[in-house]
A protein has these predicted regions:
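Short, glycine/charge-rich beta-strand/loop segments that flank catalytic centers
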Residues: 55-62, 89-98
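Catalytic core of non-heme Fe(II) oxygenases with the double-stranded beta-helix
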Residues: 98-186
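Short, solvent-exposed loop/turn segments at secondary-structure junctions
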Residues: 29-32, 122-124, 142-143, 192-196, ...
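N-terminal auxiliary "cap/dimerization" subdomain that precedes the catalytic jelly-roll/cupin core
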Residues: 1-73, 80, 185, 222-235
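A structural signal for short, well-ordered beta-strand segments
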Residues: 92-93, 117-119, 212-216
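Catalytic core of Fe(II)/2-oxoglutarate
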Residues: 150, 156-235
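Short hydrophobic/aromatic beta-strand or adjacent loop that forms the aromatic wall/cage
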Residues: 22, 114, 209-213
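A short coil-to-beta-strand element that immediately follows conserved catalytic motifs
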Residues: 81-93, 131
């Protein structure tokens, strides 16, 4: 896979990100995802989440994320969102959901980071509609938080929608989008203004579901809402 060609039109895609709040990137089907998913799955074992595993970091390095994407996102963060931190403020985590996992579904939330990228690594097949844990997201669901207090209040207020019924209600007044990732195109969106969650990975799925979640630039202080929530969740 030619990584330079992969990022060839990133400037125009990032224009869409700023304009619409989200953008899809080119497919990763040319990458050896089967080998990658096997490596990551072995590293993770029974874990649902694992931060910056060896195979995960190797993938990010192979894709040259910090050469082709991070500097451009950093520029947007500074100029469009008045970000004052540094470009190393990143959080990379693998998420593996086994078929029938009843916990990892409809947990709607905002991220604390400015940008979130969902990278599909292994997407299972399911005979049932929305049965393979696809992403549900609402771009521009809230305004950019101006401080930690507004960030906390916004997160707390939207927790009432963290259920299937709540999401159905929220979608009556907000644009809902869904992404199965069967095309293996990563999705990049504004993390702290996009309410997002996942459908369930049903027991009938052909395999586990594995994605990489890349988070860029948390504008909150070191012990802000996002950091504390990650500490509580132990990840």
């Amino acid at each position: 896979m030619n990584t330079k060609e992969y990022w060839n039109d990133i400037d125009s895609r990032l224009e869409q990100l700023v304009k619409y709040g989200f953008v899809k990137l080119p497919s990763l089907k040319e990458y050896d995802l089967d080998r990658l998913s096997n490596q990551v799955s072995i590293e993770m074992g029974a874990l649902t989440f694992k931060e910056s595993g060896i195979a995960h970091k190797n993938f990010l390095n192979n894709l040259n994320i910090n050469e082709y994407l991070t500097p451009k996102l950093f520029n947007i963060a500074q100029n469009a969102f008045n970000y004052k931190g540094d470009s190393l403020n990143q959080y990379h985590i693998a998420r593996k959901v086994e078929p029938g996992n009843s916990k990892e579904m409809y947990r709607a939330h905002f991220d604390s980071h400015l940008f979130t990228m969902v990278i599909p690594v292994k997407i299972p097949e399911s005979a049932e509609e929305n049965g393979s844990g696809g992403l549900i997201y609402f771009p521009n669901a809230r305004k950019m938080p101006s401080n930690e207090i507004s960030n906390f209040i916004g997160k707390a207020f939207h927790k009432k929608y963290a259920s299937k019924e709540g999401l159905d209600k929220f979608s009556n007044a907000h644009e809902k989008k869904e992404e199965s990732f069967m095309d293996y195109q990563p999705l990049l969106f504004i993390g702290n203004t996009t309410l997002h969650t996942n459908h369930a990975v049903l027991s009938s799925c052909s395999s586990y579901r594995l994605t990489f979640l890349a988070h860029f630039f948390d504008p909150s202080p070191k012990y802000g809402v996002g950091s504390l929530l990650r500490l509580i969740r132990n990840r």
